Curated annotation (Swiss-Prot):
Top-rank lineage group of the source organism: Eukaryota
Organism expressing this protein natively: Mus musculus (Mouse)
Xref: InterPro entries: ATPase_NBD, Carb_kinase_FGGY, FGGY_C, FGGY_N, FGGY_RbtK-like
Keywords: Kinase, Transferase
Protein name (record): FGGY carbohydrate kinase domain-containing protein
Protein's job: Postulated to function in a metabolite repair mechanism by preventing toxic accumulation of free D-ribulose formed by non-specific phosphatase activities. Alternatively, may play a role in regulating D-ribulose 5-phosphate recycling in the pentose phosphate pathway. Can phosphorylate ribitol with low efficiency.
Family: Belongs to the FGGY kinase family.
Gene3D superfamilies on file: 1.20.58.2240, 3.30.420.40
Length: 552
């Protein structure tokens, strides 16, 4: 029977997602169905190696463009709420909220240090040497991608043109909600996950003093946030008239406290109603589910009722994704970006492009069908029996938390043909799945109990990537009915802020739906167990090589 809510006239929510290379918006109804979608690329600068920058004004302009597009022709009175998610990039503004440069060139339009920027290596090393108590909530070791090292870098390198003039340091999701409402309140998600804030205790003065950023404590932490809200909480009195005009939305509609993009993906999938799909997690608590948000990089989101401390895995963060639950967040620094890197750098790439274009296929759809062609009688995964990849081309985020690790490939030959490219692509996809297995095993050893993967993000659209995750972890993989789960997650925030649902959990259960379940091929387990042994041995070998080269 349909509930009364489903029979009501449609209520709409807008979700805006700012990814690494584009801004996307969606119009979503109260059942979680995506009714309209728009995307707009955003600018990126790399003035020097490991420095990655964006422009908050360029990002906001793109938000306005895509939002206007998705609400075109819609009855404005039915739009009830707006939710934002974005990468955890750092936005720097002066006391009047104007952009400040985060670069030596003094270009103030480039006022965003991107999440994947690795300029603050020396700073994060010094922060980790303090062994401060806040570090136990980031798996024991802070990442160079978090905000404290980037802030320290700005103070040490751009004192006059940036640091001394700065009035506001925002995580990008919080910048967007401020832009929409004029409210400088921060989301608990960003502050807890990237800024060392504690949901129970607030900021820790001793940490900022110890690392040389005591000036942030001034004026009750006004530069980095002193009003903190749960994700999905309504901000101020809603959308300001100015922002409403720019976005093409009704003034005063509810705007939610934001989420980081991966957390929005987790919110969009982890609460789905799985009844009738033959999954073990059906009768189990939501804590048996692991959401894997896989795009440029991958994030592995597991929640628990009590805090679980996992070495090399971020968290436990209280209420950072689902209110009332502790979050642990594993991750891989490059996944989609690594697959692109391996494929595009191969001598056969131009041939692949030409053949895929001739067939009107994406290069990955073409590669998947090419692998089926060359596999002969064996399962496709067995093509990599002699080719093994260790995927940390950009360091290891989890579970080793070692920025110095490099990528490895063993089993190369003189072959440069399309078969060779396809098999290297397969080995790379498998390596990413083995990395997920490594994270899962580490989380389980620390106290998590996981049975099902919920995949979303760009790579979840690749059937080979999904099947390899099922086969290599031995767990079923659930894919959402809406492939754009991150946007559904952002819309869920807007729905919560509007008051149309009593809780985030209710909105998750109503608005996220199972589309497809991919089960593991258990017959191939022995083969993947062997490959996994090789995988773990590779990193040990890398450490041995380093020890030899760094020895006296």
């Amino acid at each position: 029977m349909m509930s009364g809510r489903d029979q009501e006239p449609s209520r709409y929510y807008v979700g805006i997602d700012v990814g690494t290379g584009s801004v996307r918006a969606a119009l979503v109804d109260q059942r979680g169905l995506l009714l309209a979608f728009a995307e707009q690329p955003i600018k990126k600068w790399e003035p020097q190696f490991n420095h990655h920058e964006q422009s908050s004004e360029d990002i906001w302009a793109a938000c306005c463009l895509v939002t206007k597009e998705v609400v075109q022709g819609i009855d404005a009175h039915r739009i009830r709420g707006l939710g934002f998610d974005a990468t955890c990039s750092l936005v720097v503004l002066d006391k009047e909220f104007h952009p400040l440069p985060v670069n030596h060139e003094g270009d103030s339009s480039r006022n965003v240090i991107m999440w994947l920027d690795h300029r603050a290596v020396s700073q994060v090393h010094r922060i980790n040497e303090t062994k401060h108590r806040v570090l136990q909530y980031v798996g024991g070791v802070m990442s160079v991608e978090m905000q404290a090292p980037k802030l320290l870098w700005l103070k040490e390198n751009l004192r006059e043109i940036c640091w001394d003039k700065a009035g506001h340091f925002f995580d990008l999701p919080d910048f967007l909600s401020w832009k929409a409402t004029g409210v400088t309140a921060r989301s608990l998600c960003s502050l807890v996950c990237k800024w060392t804030y504690s949901a129970e205790k607030g900021w820790d003065d001793s940490f900022w003093k110890m690392i040389g950023l005591e000036d942030l404590i001034d004026d009750n932490y006004s530069k980095i946030g002193n009003l903190v809200l749960l994700p999905g909480a309504a901000l101020g009195i809603g959308l300001t008239p100015e922002a409403a005009r720019e976005l093409g939305l009704p003034s005063g509609i509810a705007v939610a406290a934001s989420l980081i993009d991966a957390h929005a993906g987790g919110l969009g999938v982890i609460g789905a109603d799985v009844r009738g799909h033959g999954l073990t997690c059906e009768g189990q608590p939501v804590t048996s589910r692991l959401a894997v948000i896989c795009g440029t990089s991958s994030c592995h989101m597991g929640i628990s009722k009590d805090p679980v401390f996992v070495p090399g895995v971020w968290g436990p963060y209280y209420s950072a994704m689902v209110p009332g639950f502790w979050l642990n967040e594993g991750g891989q620094s490059v996944t989609g970006k690594l697959i692109d890197h391996m494929v595009q750098g191969h001598p056969a790439f131009p041939e692949l492009q030409a053949k895929a274009t001739a067939r009107c296929q994406s290069i990955y759809a073409y590669l998947n069908s090419h692998l089926d062609l060359i596999k002969k009688a064996q399962p496709v995964g067995f093509l990599t029996v002699d080719l093994h990849v260790w995927p940390d081309f950009h360091g290891n985020r989890s579970p080793l938390a070692d920025l110095t690790l490099k990528g490895m490939v063993t089993g190369l030959t003189l072959s440069q043909d399309l078969d060779d490219l396809a098999i290297l692509y397969l080995a790379t996809v498998q390596a990413i799945a083995f990395g997920t297995r490594f994270i899962i095993e580490t989380m389980e050893a620390a106290g998590h109990s996981l049975s099902t993967l919920f995949l979303c993000g760009g790579l979840s659209k690749n059937p080979l990537f999904v099947q390899m995750h099922a086969d290599i972890t031995g767990m079923p993989v659930v894919l959402s009915q809406e492939v754009e789960s991150v946007l559904v997650g952002a819309a869920i925030l807007g729905a919560c802020a509007s008051g149309d649902f009593t809780s985030v959990q209710e909105a998750m259960a109503r608005m996220s739906k199972v589309g497809k379940v991919v089960f593991p091929e258990h017959a191939d387990k022995k083969y993947y167990d062997k490959k996994y042994q090789v995988f773990l041995r590779m990193v040990e070998h890398q450490k041995e090589y380093s020890a030899i080269m760094n020895g006296s």
